[in-house]
Amino acid sequence: HAGRTVAEQGAVIGKLFANFAAVAAANPLADRRNGFTAEQIAAVGPDNPFIGFPYTKLMNSNAFIDQSAALILTSVAKAKSLGIPEEKWVYLHGCADTYDHWYISDRKDFHSSPAMRVAGEEALAMADTSLDQIGAFDIYSCFPSAVQLACQELGLATDDPRGLTITGGLPYFGGPGNNYVTHSIAEMMNRVRAEPGMKGLVTSCGNYVTKEAVGIYSTEAPHKPFAPKDPNIYQSVLNADKGRASTEAANGAATIETYTVMHDRAGPSFAILMGLLDDGSRFIANTPEDPELLSEMVANDYMGAQGRVAQYPPDPPRAAAAAEFAGPAAVGEHRIFLHRSEEH
């Protein structure tokens, strides 16, 4: 999509996450305070292997932590009755939650998130503010793609001088399962309390970049009552905007749309790919355990590579797919084979 080589992409996302690692290095609550450099994050080695190509271990969320955070949500009246000082009050100015198509095969492409775009637009509109009026961000960072997609859809540069995290992000601060955003909101409360009137924006992301949410926080009281829009209003538009048709019985000429190569402790184990048939329909596949093929798919960009796909075994009732291109693929209960073509 971006037109980069494998090496160029590694360097770009290494630099992106080095900025997160630097924030974590200065955060006493962070789990990994090493301050990894872009080169350390991108370099593949025994201590930093690929998990799912093109992402190394240091580009993945770190769930091996022991962390907790808490928030108290209440009304102004209750806060007053409890005697909580007003300088500690933080208001939610704008919020929205959306989701992209649950089935990845239903999406128009794999380099955008309409749900994040809409969540950002709705939250900013509710808060009567704009991106240039936000003083601090914490962008959900389970993997580089989550950050890149959020920035793209929000209209935020990945090297914005305001920074993209206040904690250090999931790989370095820590990724405590579904609880990370509790930490980012709690830290954002500290930030806006330290700079009264400043607005902070927090994003969250779940599943396969599926569920998206945005919240905007400030110590300044909103100028209007808290009244978020019914999410069904904008979610129905997202639901109707489907991508191309998919097939579970892929046969014929095929092109790789996108892919990843999964690794175990021994190295590359299999690839998962989304492919297109000549009629434009999409299929899901994975490769056989072919070390030569998998090494090629890691060393070179195979997006757009062409070949053939057919089901395996060839006889019903449980046919799957056999072909000439890359190696076996699973679609539902089917097994699909893509063998390398001579052209690639």
What are these regions (language model features)?
Residues Y208-T210:
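Gly/Pro-rich active-site capping loops and adjacent beta-alpha segments
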Residues G177-K199:
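Phosphate/diphosphate-binding loops
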